[in-house]
Amino acid sequence: MAQSKLYPVVMAGGSGSRLWPLSRVLYPKQFLCLKGDLTMLQTTICRLNGVECESPVVICNEQHRFIVAEQLRQLNKLTENIILEPAGRNTAPAIALAALAAKRHSPESDPLMLVLAADHVIADEDAFRAAVRNAMPYAEAGKLVTFGIVPDLPETGYGYIRRGEVSAGEQDMVAFEVAQFVEKPNLETAQAYVASGEYYWNSGMFLFRAGRYLEELKKYRPDILDACEKAMSAVDPDLNFIRVDEEAFLACPEESVDYAVMERTADAVVVPMDAGWSDVGSWSSLWEISAHTAEGNVCHGDVINHKTENSYVYAESGLVTTVGVKDLVVVQTKDAVLIADRNAVQDVKKVVEQIKADGRHEHRVHREVYRPWGKYDSIDAGDRYQVKRITVKPGEGLSVQMHHHRAEHWVVVAGTAKVTIDGDIKLLGENESIYIPLGATHCLENPGKIPLDLIEVRSGSYLEEDDVVRFADRYGRV
């Protein structure tokens, strides 16, 4: 019997606020390089090398779509495989969208879905792939498999799964019926769980047939399935994106896959996985899984430590030094600095809530912002002016646009700029500049083979990004 098609489904939603100031609403942790040269999303996809599967399906928030597309493009994995959620509705609806898409793509069969989170670290990738292979026969037989992480300490930050009887399966394949899903326990209870040998950490990773998941969702949460079917019935293809119907999806209830299906179904089984797994839920957990110096420090960027022990020090720009401290987390970005006791980093989320309550922007966006055409860095700002460094990738261009409240000056630093102002086209080289009057229709393009760098000086009564009227845009943002 031929093996069923396997669709990896990578859930790339979430804001990762406990890793602020690196992780922010518009650039959360799954898109960051926290370990090595690849982002967490890219590492998750590369982990599938050696697993016979189709191109991965990525589910993300609409505002992250160009980040996901660029990171997939860098891996040569970009197809029409990015499902956009108009708003987060937790994991049960997200997986339902992916299941409906998989069934639509393979109508002749009931394909398998390997559901993964984009922000997990797995040290032993061979063990991960072995667990997936172990789970395949159970999923093909109609079971809903969850992967249980073999615990190595009494962690209170994870939910647990209590295993039941051994589930019937092929020789050398080990899975257990799920006896119970358990919420995050206190320390004493977690210690008892680990000592019993009957409990696993709940990883949030799953393997099942798309049709079986939809059957169980229809049985237990038909309202979720109905909303997702309506959302998928009016899909709007957009470049490499699958844009679901916004009104239908916003009507969908929020629910996790555990609550909606896994805790209710009679067909849930747990496959153990002992692979050095972490969900990197805090700065302390990132410190724990990273390579340490002899003094127990983890350092990134331009860092000098003196008599510093067991600390995490991250410098995004410029030099960061520490003297005579221990057990600290120090994270410096271009517009914010975090200094925290390593044992109190769970409260970083409260700082983020305060920043949001104060009406500040540092919880939402970095100083450096990525766009489909490149990026910009807000260098300076004051009363009625703002200075940015803009980088446009070769062959890319900004939308044809105008502004009601600001004029702009552009000075080319490197590369060649093709500038159109009210129909007049000019080519600018290094050290050349141009003025865009308030209200002028204009466009910036990079016709060259190297990145275009320019300095933009905005002046006017209102300088925010929402002062823009787009007339044409190659990225569908009109």
Curated annotation (Swiss-Prot):
Superkingdom field: Bacteria
Listed pathway(s): Nucleotide-sugar biosynthesis; GDP-alpha-D-mannose biosynthesis; GDP-alpha-D-mannose from alpha-D-mannose 1-phosphate (GTP route): step 1/1
Keywords (A to Z) from UniProt: Capsule biogenesis/degradation, GTP-binding, Lipopolysaccharide biosynthesis, Nucleotide-binding, Nucleotidyltransferase, Transferase
Record keyword GTP-binding present: yes
Gene Ontology molecular function, alphabetical: GTP binding; mannose-1-phosphate guanylyltransferase (GTP) activity
InterPro entries, sorted: GMPP_N, Man1P_GuaTrfase/Man6P_Isoase, Man6P_isomerase-2_C, ManC/GMP-like_b-helix, Mannose-6P_isomerase_type2, NTP_transferase_dom, Nucleotide-diphossugar_trans, RmlC-like_jellyroll
Keyword Nucleotidyltransferase appears in the UniProt entry: yes
One GO biological process term: lipopolysaccharide biosynthetic process
Reaction it catalyzes: alpha-D-mannose 1-phosphate + GTP + H(+) = GDP-alpha-D-mannose + diphosphate
Enzyme nomenclature, EC number: 2.7.7.13
Function: Involved in the biosynthesis of the capsular polysaccharide colanic acid.
NCBIfam families in the record: GMP_PMI (TIGR01479), PRK15460.1 (NF012004)
Family named by the database record: Belongs to the mannose-6-phosphate isomerase type 2 family.
Stated name of the protein: Mannose-1-phosphate guanylyltransferase
Organism of derivation: Escherichia coli (strain K12)
Species lineage: Bacteria, Pseudomonadati, Pseudomonadota, Gammaproteobacteria, Enterobacterales
Record gene name: manC
